[in-house]
A protein has these predicted regions:
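Non-heme di-metal
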Residues: 1-191
Length: 191
């Protein structure tokens, strides 16, 4: 458990812009992580490979903890007068679980064209985003500016922990997608 007591108002590079960029990720990650879990779990029953089934369970567990820890960081934002819940609710309704959200509209539309196409597309989106996240995670460890001197230690600890787990499970969604539908077009359609 990372302590988020006394997080500096401009805890990234001493910059309001850089800090708010990172803060926005703390707001986006909880619903995004839940979307990733939903998109992978939809196909867990179709997976035959026992090792991959274990990897899926581990992935879902890690993503759930990521969501919780980033949402826990919101307390530091509240203390600074920020209101992360407003944007999180907006994001949830428009992108994820609202009746006319991107997730529901695209899934329903694509499933009309071909059974499970919407679910496969969501899995493809998850695969692409997990790939990008792993690239950013890897860069975080090699970026000279990503030090306690430039980033509040609490923020850096949370980001390093999350980054290490992203690197650890970076191939799980790709492996699930390849087992569910090995279509190259599906894989690259969202890249």
């Amino acid at each position: 458990d990372v302590s988020f007591d006394r997080v500096p108002e401009h805890g990234v590079l001493g910059s309001a812009i850089a800090t708010n960029f990172v803060n926005s990720m703390h707001v986006v990650f909880p619903e995004g992580e839940k979307f990733f879990v939903r998109s992978v779990r939809r196909f867990s029953k179709d997976i035959k490979d026992e090792h991959l089934k274990k990897e899926i369970n581990s992935f879902c567990g890690q993503e759930g903890v990521h969501a919780r820890e980033h949402q826990r960081f919101w307390e530091a934002m509240y203390e600074q007068g920020l209101k992360p819940d407003w944007f999180a609710n907006f994001l949830k309704v428009t992108a994820f679980s609202g009746k006319y959200s991107y997730e529901n509209v695209s899934k329903n539309l694509l499933n009309r064209l071909q059974p499970n196409l919407g679910d496969k597309f969501a899995l493809s989106v998850t695969t692409a985003l997990e790939h990008y996240t792993a690239i950013m995670a890897n860069a975080l460890f090699y970026e000279p500016m990503a030090t306690n001197k430039n980033i509040a230690p609490q923020m850096l600890e949370l980001l390093h922990w999350h980054a290490s787990e992203e690197i650890e499970h970076k191939a799980v969604c790709f492996d699930v997608l390849k087992e569910v539908d090995d279509s190259y077009i599906l894989r690259v359609s969202v890249m």
